[in-house]
Amino acid sequence: VDSLVGSEMCIRDSYYTVQIKRGVIMGEYIENFVDALPDPKRVKEIKKDLESKGVKYIYSHWIDFLGSPKTKPMPISDFEDLCAGKGPQFAVHSVSFVPELGPADNDQIPVPDLDSLLICPWDKTCAWVFSDLWWNGKPYDVCPRQTLKKQIKKNAEADLKFYVGMEPEFFVMKWEDGKPVKAIDRDPIPLRRQAFGYDSEYSIEGMDFLKEIIDILNEDLKWDLHDVVAEGAYGQYELDFGYTDMLGMADRFIFLRVLLKEIAKKHGYFISFMPKTQISDWRSGAHINHSVESISEKNKNIYKDGDKFSARAMNAVAGMLEHGAAITALACPTVNSYNGFVPSVEGLDGGMHTWAPTHMTYGSNNRSAMIRLPQNRFCIEDRASDLTQNPYLTFTLLSAAVTKGITENMQPPEATNKSLYDITEEEGKKIKTLPRNLLEAIDAFKADPLTKEVFSEAMLNNFIGYKYDEWSRYHTTTTDWEI
């Protein structure tokens, strides 16, 4: 759309023809839709810049409710059409679990968020942009990105802006004789008591792969990677990079999963985000660290009160604990996610502590609790989280719980500052455990009234229905442990 003022214009897609006369937008659908379209002048400038850098193709990605990116690759020549809402449309309900819609329903239209645009580091002839889905002239209510943006607006109405940092952990794997094995594994003894974390030789051995990741994150993407951690199992790594706003971190999370897979392919490897790849290994998590800024007091971290955590930080903790099981259903959304919430790894010379959370409580630097208050920064860490999640949905519910805790002045129980692996049976009765399996988590999610406030009915029906089905399908198999 070059201008909304002047002679009669016409925007046409598969289902709608809408007239625009003298700056008046005729019809509710196009009023909302056009308001969301990027500025045409900016679009032209970006297209010119991309072409000058050798970009020939565009991936406009929307995210399904499970957290998978979807796209139709298109030539750069169609970039302006994409940004004007005249690009590819999607029958989202044909490729995603949306039983409310059928083959006769209208398609969804992606509107790109140009602030998320980047050039793909693994193929610099391609650019990537995240898009929001629109349907029948309104934000599509099963679009996770739209859902998070809606909650961000609610948070802002309470004078709160969230910043998030994540600690993604994963295994680097390869195929050997038709079986998946660890690609970086120098230890001939698969089971031993000693943990492998921070191992120097192990870190050095992985550098051929890791150097490329480090350079991309810092030089190409400017994500401010601080370090790479050799985690507690061979072949397992953690990336620690800078925090950003909540929507930006959700975008980074999705892009990182794709990036790691693409770079691994170049080395003959593949990446496993499975939380618990084998019983003898540590769990792979993706801890969520968040802080909150007061919008009216710019740059003020409301979790900091001198050299201690503030009263509002405690309100936030209370909100997270109140809705902890429901948040965990989103942050740990697979059957396998719950295999790691155990105090120790058996078989390692009598067992070895995993440092995985087991209870819905909090403590000062307590890594055995769901919520940790770190000793070196004023943020709140949710440790019951992994890389299989849809971050847009997790951040939506987590921030809603925190906002509720702060605005309602909720108070948490007493902190637990001892290892939860060593508590007595009597002490354990006073502290709720994390959900023990996916079914418990989804039951809690379904019963939590806050989920109905922040998610559309269609989103809830889709997620809950799919996860119940996933639990049922899991029980059609027999595991090696049972045999």
Please describe what each predicted stretch is:
Residues 118-125, 162-163, 228-233, 281, ...:
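Short glycine/proline-enriched loop/turn "hinge" motifs that connect secondary-structure elements
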Residues 27-33, 42-45, 85, 262-263, ...:
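Catalytic-core signal marking the mid-to-C-terminal active-site face
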Residues 129-135, 237-244, 290, 382:
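Short, hydrophobic beta-strand segments
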Residues 1-13:
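Single conserved hydrophobic/aromatic residue that forms the stacking wall/gate
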Residues 65-70, 138, 172, 233, ...:
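Flexible loop/turn segments at secondary-structure boundaries
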Residues 163-171, 183-200, 220-241, 271-291, ...:
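Core alpha/beta catalytic barrel or barrel-like domain that forms the active/cofactor pocket
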Residues 229, 242, 249-277:
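Gly/Pro-rich turn-and-neighbor structural signature
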Residues 26-225, 244, 249-252, 269, ...:
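ATP/Mg2+-dependent ligation/transfer catalytic cores
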